[in-house]
Amino acid sequence: MAKKTVLRLTGVERTYGQGETSLSILRKADFELKSGEMVALVAPSGTGKSTLLHLAGLLEHPDAGEVLINGAPCNGLPDEARTAIRRSDIGFVYQFHHLLPEFTAVENVMMPQLIAGLTQAEARKRASALLDYMRVGHRGEHRPAELSGGEQQRVAIARAVANAPLLLLADEPTGNLDPETAHYVFDALEALVRQSGLAALIATHNHDLANRMDRRVTLADGKIVDF
């Protein structure tokens, strides 16, 4: 079965500032990401990795070009529609977990599901299953401060996919972890992506992890290129 294109960028441009102080990050950039595909985004700091992830995640608007999620153009959509797409179709993972400290692990994973309209019972059942899959189910009733760094990040990954998104965007998801823990967390992330058929774009400086993905891209002269 042919894989579906989940994310497409066509001729995307993004510039910050104006005049002599302007900084062009993306120049007529093209990119495609298909379901079940893991792509590593490897580039030096300051070259636009976060900008690319923000555009793909509908957190920023391109100055030109088009961003399509699951074949649907997203340019010009009102904020409410963009928010709805983010909630239903896109999951985000960051270097720092951003878990809500006052809630337990299972409650953190329940949160996006409750916002999406699931009942407490439905949300708790799925949250518990995801935590079990990420091998932290036994820590479900603990708050983030009581978890190790690797456990926190696995909870954050479970939260990111709680609403079964089509697209996962991760910005240095193992960057704050020691090498052994980073590989352990990535093992869980990779298994989840492969099992669910997610499309995943993962920014990382870790070349060992990048080499485990389906392909690698970088940013060069405002373009997104394979290497």
From Swiss-Prot:
ATP binds at A43, P44, S45, G46, T47, G48, K49, S50. Its EC number is 7.6.2.-. InterPro entries: AAA+_ATPase, ABC_transporter-like_ATP-bd, ABC_transporter-like_CS, ABC_transpr_LolD-like, MacB-like_ATP-bd, P-loop_NTPase. It is found in: Cell inner membrane. It is a peripheral membrane protein. SMART domains: AAA (SM00382). GO terms for molecular function: ATP binding; ATP hydrolysis activity; ATPase-coupled transmembrane transporter activity. It is an enzyme of class 7 (translocase). Residues 7-227 form the ABC transporter domain. Part of the ABC transporter complex LolCDE involved in the translocation of mature outer membrane-directed lipoproteins, from the inner membrane to the periplasmic chaperone, LolA. Responsible for the formation of the LolA-lipoprotein complex in an ATP-dependent manner. Belongs to the ABC transporter superfamily. Lipoprotein translocase (TC 3.A.1.125) family. This is Lipoprotein-releasing system ATP-binding protein LolD. It comes from Agrobacterium fabrum (strain C58 / ATCC 33970) (Agrobacterium tumefaciens (strain C58)).
